[in-house]
A protein has these predicted regions:
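Conserved segment of the thioredoxin-like fold in thiol-based oxidoreductases
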Residues: 78-112
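Short active-site neighborhood of thiol/selenol oxidoreductases, capturing the structured segment around
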Residues: 45-67
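Short, internal strand/loop/helix patches
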Residues: 103-128
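Non-catalytic, surface beta->alpha helical segment in thiol-disulfide oxidoreductase systems
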Residues: 120, 124-126, 130-161
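Short acidic-hydrophobic, aromatic-tinged amphipathic segments that line or gate anion-handling sites
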Residues: 37-42, 107-115, 142
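Typically the conserved alpha-helix immediately C-terminal to a functionally engaged Cys/Sec
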Residues: 65-81, 91, 144-145
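N-terminal "domain-start" segment that seeds a small globular fold
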Residues: 2-47
Length: 161
């Protein structure tokens, strides 16, 4: 009887941070965003993500899990506009408007990026969500774990949970 909830609603291990590489406290090379090799395919970020604390979400406009993450981020940003969230988006220009219409995440600054620069940042897992402190990856989370409280706690104490 105790196992019934897990049988009826199994944990999706393919989308939990348990499957993210546990490596943290390493510098994320953001330089390609500011000096992209494929400059025609990458919009330079509107803020300097290399300095200060940021929650960086790397999303695809066509990925359903990325849309869930964007919707959660919209609510987090709506509840606390001071949280420094930034999106790096991948997809064709025609997909941007439907993404924003669906997620209503137009309250979050973003840049579009494609090609090698995007692949280098995202790898093969989307959405990719990092807590960054001066370009150092302090924590990686998946969209299931997005928590306004945890982000605010990290911003205030410097300790990521």
């Amino acid at each position: 009887a105790i196992a019934v909830p897990f049988i009826v609603n199994p944990v999706e291990y393919s989308y939990t941070s348990n499957n993210l590489s546990e490596a943290i406290n390493y510098p994320l090379d953001l330089e390609p965003l500011y000096n992209p090799v494929d400059s025609g395919k990458c919009e330079i970020p509107k803020v300097d993500l290399r300095r200060g604390k940021h929650v960086l979400a790397i999303l695809s406009l066509s990925c359903s899990h990325c849309r869930v993450a964007a919707k959660k981020f919209r609510l987090i940003k709506q509840n606390n506009p001071g949280i420094p969230i930034y999106f790096i988006l991948n997809g064709d220009t025609a997909s941007y408007r439907p993404f924003i219409t669906d997620t209503k995440a137009n309250n979050i600054p973003s840049s579009q990026c494609a090609g090698r620069t995007f692949i280098k940042l995202a790898s093969m897992q989307l959405p990719r969500i990092y807590y960054l402190d001066n370009s150092i990856v302090v924590k990686k989370v998946d969209y299931f774990e997005l928590s306004q409280y945890n982000i605010e706690d990290w911003l205030n104490t410097g300790k990521a949970k």
